[in-house]
Amino acid sequence: MSNTAYIGSGTTLSSKYYLRSFYRSNREAGTSSKRREFSGNQLALADGRALRQAVRRLPSSDFSDDQDTNTRNSVLAYIQTYNNMLSSAGSSSDRTLERSAKQLKNITSEYSSELDKIGITINDDGTLTSRTTLFESADLSKFKELFSADAAYMQRTSTYAKRFASRGEALVASDNNRLMQKKNAAATGSSATDGTTTSGATESPDDGTATTAAQIVSQSLDLDTLLNTGIGKNINIIL
């Protein structure tokens, strides 16, 4: 049984409850104040997954009078999720995401008349808005025509929601791989710069200075020995 949880005919679940359940894989991405903390690709992944969850959950709704408020609230959460998806697609330069979002907008526009009958308006940018008075009074049978398991709108939306989520997942994986490569490159560069070997020892480059200095010291000691013993006072020593 789904998380819509038919807790009882007297239990009312808010649209925020449904929105959180749709964004269960990343609930902060479903919160307006938190969305700015994520990259565009992370939002695309979260929105795609949430939309997939929405089109799975909505068809399981009861669409009965005792679930009246819950049904409408779940659709309100769907509207927010759908709009979030369009937002993340619009801020992305990825053509696959753009195509999937465009297909979803085209599908939704085909049902503009049915949506209008339950108080949902399609705006010029493709986003959805509910008109409170009609949305709250429209017959539930009209909601069922759009959002039940047999509804073509849900079935078609599910296909492109899956594509959108899959592309978002691929983009995030690619971003993570690039980040890991940069970290590895930075770590390798740091080790090369400070001369650290794998054993942790630090090697100093030998430019011949150490050898020359040792030779000079050795020759100086020999010179001191000769002078102190009085032998070879007129000897010329070439260093």
Residues of each region from the PLM?
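Polar, low-complexity export/assembly segments characteristic of proteins
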Residues: 1-239
